[in-house]
Amino acid sequence: MTLYSRPTCPHCHRVRLVLAEKGIAMEIINIEGSKLPEDLVELNPYNNVPTLVDRELALYDPRIIMEYLEERFPHPPLMPVDPVARARFRLALYRIERDWYSLVDEIEQSPGKPHVRAKKFLRESLLAAADAFAAKPYFLSDEFSLVDCSIAPILWRLPRYEIDLPAQAKALGKYAERIFNRPAFKSSLTELEREMRDAA
């Protein structure tokens, strides 16, 4: 099993976090620069990462990869068993991608630009969801889940994006610290991702 990843990509980070939480041993090929390995170009028509290769199977959407890993390696579980609860979690994953990752992608695609609009909307959207982070130890749950795996890379990058959260977002800050202190989160970080916080 092989994961093609970039060392600073937030989408790759959330897949790496799932791997770390589940203790899955996997070859991770870190791609730096614009040139992609030839085998990746052949496997993935979109030429992007993360891309997971498991024997004859090649997956190249982060959410599909995360759910595949959850089903292939069910322990520890990162999704609830109940179908209604699973549907709620899937909807949360969809909204995180649509509402937050769309803005993150805008910021990440041209890091030299100010991206005032995207940063403003991301900050406001996180603040609007702040109460959801106060209700339980993890997002919508007492247990760590794929939803948290998707949120954590965004929160880790806020200083890099020059997004500061006000005092009233204390619950969000505490939630972030809970996740950042998890051993799996620490081991999911690449050297360049560690430097994002060291430099902030």
Task: Enumerate the predicted regions with their spans.
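Hydrophobic/aromatic-lined pockets within catalytic cores
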Residues: 70-74, 97, 134, 159, ...
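GST-like domain detector, emphasizing the conserved glutathione-binding G-site
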Residues: 1-130, 137
